[in-house]
A protein has these predicted regions:
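Canonical AAA+ ATPase core
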Residues: 41-46, 63-71, 79-170, 219-222
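Short beta-strand-centered segment that lines the nucleotide-binding/catalytic pocket of NTP-utilizing
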Residues: 19-31, 88-95
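Conserved alpha-helical scaffold flanking the Walker A/P-loop in AAA+ ATPase domains
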Residues: 40-60
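Hydrophobic aliphatic residues
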Residues: 12, 16, 29, 38, ...
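Residue-level signature of catalytic and energy-coupling elements of molecular machines
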Residues: 1, 34, 75, 122, ...
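Basic, amphipathic alpha-helical bundle interface domains used for macromolecular binding and assembly
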Residues: 144-235
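Conserved Walker
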Residues: 7, 70, 74
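Walker A/P-loop
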Residues: 1-26
Length: 235
C-alpha cells in the first residue's frame, strides 16, 4: 500500500480523452454494483436498466482482491466477453475497453486470493516496488510544496483504435511464434527444456491465453520501437 498504484492508473486514464470509472472493491460489493441492474420505475410501471461503472473505456478495479469471488467473476466475465447481460438484454461494452486492477498483498487482512482462472484473463502484471531514496526525497519535496500536475488528454479514443489496427499488422514470423510457444511450454514442461531446477517454483504453467497475449504484447512493443516486425527481444 502507498506506492501510488491507483494514482498511476488514474493519471494514465486522464491522458486519454475517454470515459473513466473507478470501482472500489470492498467485501460488501455486489455484482450488480459493477455491471448494473434493473430498477422498477413506479412512474412508467416497468423495469429500467441502470448501467454500472463497467460501461466505460477505462476501468480501474481498485483493490480487486478485497471483494468476494462472485464480484470478481462479474468483472472478469465482462473483460472476456466484452459484453454484459442485465436482465434478459445483452449490452456491448464500449471500445476501447481496458481494465486495470490493483491488489494488495494476500497476507493482508480482508483480502481474497484471485483464482488462477481469473488471473489468467489479465494480459500483464506489473510489480510495483519501493522508490529509490532520491525518488522518495523528491516525493516528499513535491508533496510538501503542494505541487500538482496539470494533466490534460493528449490522445483520443479513435487514435488508440487506429493504433490497434496498425499493431495487428506488425509482422510476426513463424520462428517468433515458435519462440513464444517454447517459452510457454517451458513453464508447463520445464524438464523438456533442461530446466528441472525451476519446476518447484512453478505452480501452474502458462495457458494458451498466455501465448496469445505474449504475441500481442511483442507486437505492441515492436510498434512502440518503430518497427513493423517482431524480434526476439520484443518477446
Amino acid at each position: 500500500p502507498g506506492l501510488a498504484k491507483t494514482l498511476a492508473i488514474k493519471t494514465l486514464a486522464q491522458l486519454v480523452n475517454t470515459e473513466f470509472s473507478r470501482i472500489q472493491f470492498t467485501p460488501d460489493l455486489l455484482p450488480a454494483d459493477v455491471i448494473g441492474t434493473l430498477i422498477y420505475s413506479q412512474k412508467t410501471e416497468s423495469f429500467q436498466v441502470k448501467k454500472g461503472p463497467v460501461f466505460s473505456n477505462f476501468i480501474l478495479a481498485d483493490e480487486i482482491n478485497r471483494a468476494p469471488a462472485k464480484v470478481q467473476s462479474a468483472l472478469l466475465e465482462a473483460m472476456q466477453e466484452h459484453q454484459v447481460t442485465i436482465g434478459s438484454t445483452t449490452f456491448d461494452l464500449p471500445s476501447p475497453f481496458l481494465v486495470m486492477a490493483t491488489q494488495n498483498p494476500i497476507e493482508q487482512e480482508g483480502t481474497y486470493q484471485l483464482p488462477e482462472a481469473q488471473v489468467d484473463r489479465f494480459m500483464l502484471k506489473v510489480i510495483i516496488d519501493y522508490p529509490t531514496i532520491e525518488e522518495e526525497k523528491q516525493i516528499i519535496r513535491e508533496n510538501l510544496n503542494g505541487l500538482k500536475a496539470d494533466i490534460k488528454p493528449v490522445v483520443e479514443a479513435s487514435e488508440i483504435l487506429n493504433a490497434r489496427k496498425i499493431v495487428n499488422q506488425v509482422y510476426l514470423d513463424e520462428k517468433i511464434e515458435q519462440y513464444i510457444a517454447d517459452i510457454v511450454f517451458a513453464t508447463r514442461y520445464p524438464e523438456r527444456y533442461g530446466l528441472e531446477n525451476i519446476k518447484p517454483l512453478i505452480t501452474f504453467g502458462g495457458s494458451p491465453r498466455a501465448s496469445i497475449n505474449l504475441a500481442k504484447a511483442a507486437r505492441a512493443y515492436a510498434f512502440i520501437n518503430h518497427r513493423g516486425y517482431v524480434v526476439p527481444e520484443d518477446v
